[in-house]
Amino acid sequence: MQLHELKPAPGSRQKPTRKGQGIGSGLGKTAGRGHKGQKARSGGGVRPGFEGGQQPLQRRLPKRGFTNARFKKEFAIINVGDLDVFEAGTVVTPELLLERKMIKKLKDGVKLLADGNIEKALTVKLHGVSEAAAEKIKAAGGQVEVM
C-alpha cells in the first residue's frame, strides 16, 4: 500500500447535506428550520442560558463564597521518596532539583510531600514542606529549612 492508495474506512465518512437544494433532497425550501420564528431567521436564536424571559437559573441561585484563584500559589511537587537518589549530606535546593530534571519548572516554589521513604541524611531547603515529610527527613538524620 502506498500513500496515494489510502482510503477512509467504509461508512466512516458521510456526504455533507446540502440544505435548501430542492424538494427532492429532503432539506429543500425551509432547509430543516421549520416555518418562520426567531430560529428560522439568519443569525437567529437565543443566547446560551436564555430561558424565554423567565429568570434564568444563574440569576435565581445566590452568589456564594469567594475565590482567590488569580493569586493562588502553585507549587511544583516532589515527594520524600524521590530524594533518595541524592548522596548523604547533599543540600537539596529548588535549583538542584531543576538541574536534575526532577521538576519541570519552579512555578511559585517547590513543596515537599511525604510519599515514599528516605534513608539518607539530607539538608532540604525548599519553599514548603509538609509536617509528615519534615518528620521523615529528621528521622533519617537530615535537616529541613523552609525558604
Curated annotation (Swiss-Prot):
Top-rank taxon, per record: Bacteria
Keyword check for RNA-binding: yes
Location of the region described as Disordered in the Swiss-Prot/TrEMBL record: 1-65
Pfam families xref list: Ribosomal_L27A (PF00828)
One GO cellular component term: cytosolic large ribosomal subunit
Record keywords: Ribonucleoprotein, Ribosomal protein, RNA-binding, rRNA-binding
Molecular function via GO: rRNA binding; structural constituent of ribosome
GO biological process, one term: translation
Biased composition (Gly residues): 21-31, 42-52
InterPro entries: Ribosomal_uL15 (IPR030878), Ribosomal_uL15/eL18 (IPR021131), Ribosomal_uL15/eL18_sf (IPR036227), Ribosomal_uL15_bac-type (IPR005749), Ribosomal_uL15_CS (IPR001196)
Job description of the protein: Binds to the 23S rRNA.
Quaternary structure (record): Part of the 50S ribosomal subunit.
Family statement drawn from the similarity comment of this UniProt entry: Belongs to the universal ribosomal protein uL15 family.
Protein name, per record: Large ribosomal subunit protein uL15
Source species of the chain: Heliobacterium modesticaldum (strain ATCC 51547 / Ice1)
